[in-house]
């Protein structure tokens, strides 16, 4: 069973409700139908029911819930909640009433209120517009200071990682993390790996240096981040700074990182900045013909995930399944 097939089966075992707010896009409507038919999640589309059904045509939307963010009886309650959350930032109640009509804000508020368990958007909207409501309304998860992202990389015919499966972070969100932020990314990514892959995380803090083979401000940041992560999560298997070959290849680890409990068997790879992470995941995807699932958001109080604007309906189904599994781990 592939990684995604396993995720879909897990989603079906404890069905959650996922909001798809971009109902003016046919890919989203197709995905909503597929998610319902496969029993992956309950689905809420946000928009005008007549317009959605007209666009859907012959697509079966039986069981899909539709909420109209422009004419909902919940608008005043949602607006009041948004106002209370944002008044310290200068938001007025009038502005809150207008803002909450935006399907992205309305969808996130459904998640905030417990009327849905997660949201998936980005087929039409930018990453910034997709995640802004989540950051403003949901905030970070308990014990987490930073929202970041990761990819699950499944490399065919690969003896490294967990049977060729890795988590790469951060490849999509935090541009130039400082040492403290890098430690937060590492801890969150380890939890994400355990949650989605179901194996023990072995975290490598990557650099162009292994154990002081080179010294610079760049390597010092990774060393400090490793120390901070160990202090914050003493039971976490984490080491650094490590070059990527020392991190994943046992023979190289023996010479470059003697005594390391992680080197040679890392399955969670933490990159020093967004440049390195983004380049690495795309190289792995293209040259190694790996499956890349992401960017998946981590660190939010409840899951909200972003899509590529070039996504297919099938891609949306996959991200919805991952979001549903993330929602299974949210503590009430």
Curated annotation (Swiss-Prot):
Q: What InterPro entries does the database record attribute to this sequence?
A: P_Ac_Bu_trans (IPR012147), P_AcTrfase (IPR004614), P_AcTrfase_dom1 (IPR042113), P_AcTrfase_dom2 (IPR042112), Phos_Acetyltrans/Butyryltrans (IPR050500), PTA_PTB (IPR002505)
Task: Tell me which EC number(s) this protein carries.
Answer: 2.3.1.8
Q: Which domain of life is it from?
A: Bacteria
The answer on whether this UniProt entry bears the keyword Acyltransferase reads: yes
| Reactions that this protein is recorded to catalyse | acetyl-CoA + phosphate = acetyl phosphate + CoA
**Keywords annotated in UniProt:** Acyltransferase, Cytoplasm, Transferase
Q: What class of enzyme is it?
A: transferase
One GO biological-process annotation of the entry reads:
acetyl-CoA biosynthetic process
**Single GO MF descriptor:** phosphate acetyltransferase activity
Classification via Pfam families = PTA_PTB
Which GO cellular component terms are attached?
cytoplasm
Q: Where in the cell is it found?
A: Cytoplasm
Pathway(s): Metabolic intermediate biosynthesis; acetyl-CoA biosynthesis; acetyl-CoA from acetate: step 2/2
Q: Which family does it belong to?
A: Belongs to the phosphate acetyltransferase and butyryltransferase family.
Descriptive protein name: Phosphate acetyltransferase
| Native species | Acetivibrio thermocellus (strain ATCC 27405 / DSM 1237 / JCM 9322 / NBRC 103400 / NCIMB 10682 / NRRL B-4536 / VPI 7372)
Q: Which gene encodes it?
A: pta
